[in-house]
Amino acid sequence: SIINADDEKVTSFADKIDDLKSFTLNAPRKGQLGVVEDLIVDRAFIPNSEAEAIEIATLKDLKNAVPHTVSNALAAGALARSAGILSESIAAGLRNFEPGLHRISVVMERDEVTWINDSKATNPHAAGAALRTFQKVVWIAGGLAKGATMDDLVKTNRDRIRVALLIGQDRELIARSLAKYAPETIIERIDGLTGKEVMQNAVNRAKQICEAGDVVLLAPACASMDQFENYAERGQIFTDSVLRLE
């Protein structure tokens, strides 16, 4: 079995698993894959794992080396190594892998501000994975929550969300969680006559208030159908709006 050693819920029952291997974003111990500087290394599927590690890839092999992407690469690498796949083949596979559209895609980096399209983050869990990646965020969020609660998402990431620009039908659900658990976060509600206009207004407002070091992150934590055809349209309008900024 292969588990994520950085996940406390998973590791809480690890002692019940036979022949356990794991992966971590940190330097690996015996029986783990992990990261050393910019290398992804294996100390699990080699003869002398007590004293040695082998490189199976580098972070440069990944299209977007944010933490959860690295974690996914480690999981895939561990499965491949367990099947006897050579490290060269794993590195090639990671280099050739094309991430899905609208999933933590860097749209633009300008004036020390990074613009990220994660429109595919249609629920709190996915949005949380994106928020945890960055330190200082102007967060564009909202849409159809479909009964989801935002409390845990906000509590976990309250120190990262500098500004929240809220859109969509269930934006007040997010606003209430922010007011309760992240009272220092600036909250603004963005309106418009159409979904396209709303997103353009959100992007323009983000441009006005962003600071050096900010990440402007579209990670709505909600479905899109209240204002858009689907998450892809939402993400594309965001991308187009960002690229049109002067």
Q: What are the residue ranges of the model-derived segments?
A:
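Nucleotide phosphate-binding/pyrophosphate-handling subdomain across enzymes
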Residues: 57-161
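Extended acidic/charged loop-beta regions that coordinate divalent cations
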Residues: 11-59, 100-103, 107, 134
